[in-house]
């Protein structure tokens, strides 16, 4: 007699700017949970978090997933409850393991992971510490530097350094003394290139800092480099393994949000055409990086590679990488011999480890 299926709570949507991407990622995860043997292994309960942080149960969540679009306010049941988390929706008390598919703040920064910890229920992906450190680029860079992993030169900044002319001038001089143009200004706690800008001169630097400061009080400015963009996927519980290495090529000046999520704007090469030594270095450093920040479960680790100088720099760790039909994480594992059916199963098997 076969055992009863495990009930998986797939949570998607969220308050971040990556809300729509989360819906698309959840579609892929839900598909994977219905493929092959997973049909017998798992029962899926969908939970949708709207842009105001309200949690909705399977009925509305199923409609959102089917349409692929967030509902209009007029389509939500009235009267609307107060924004934010007010308890689990009806129909979710049967969930045995949670599968968060939430990109950006509140999803991959340790927030929802902390909620699952308080509920004493297992969940897919990195824990509170690994999620929080990886999300904050300042904290992540400090941890990676402590592990001896090479990164491009960078300067950390605070939004309040732009509060008056004297402090702003001091910040600009600090950046210009440590970095050359072009450089990239990033909010420390957003993903999918949201809020990132490229500065070729001081005027653009000021504009980029002010833009990023509207989104995050913590900022990072990085040296621009002429390099290829490479990505490696990591999977596992207490023991991690790395996928083949992929490359992203794009027609834009840099890999911004529109380029990432618009069909035809970027091309992926899997596996990337690279020397064997570089491939092994990237795979090894991907696992080292996850260990440095305490990440288990899954991650996508991004690198820069200057083939003219044979130099590799670690860029960042994404603990809840995109899972859409054009996202690198599932494609890297597919090229490594792990199907979508196997991938979501392994991720669920690693939950709680």
Swiss-Prot record:
GO terms for molecular function: ATP binding; D-alanine-D-alanine ligase activity; metal ion binding. Mg(2+) 2 binds at residues 316, 318. ATP binds at residues 176-231. Residues 141-349 form the ATP-grasp domain. It is found in: Cytoplasm. It catalyses: 2 D-alanine + ATP = D-alanyl-D-alanine + ADP + phosphate + H(+). Keywords: ATP-binding, Cell shape, Cell wall biogenesis/degradation, Cytoplasm, Ligase, Magnesium, Manganese, Metal-binding, Nucleotide-binding, Peptidoglycan synthesis. Belongs to the D-alanine--D-alanine ligase family. Cell wall formation. This is D-alanine--D-alanine ligase. The gene is ddl.
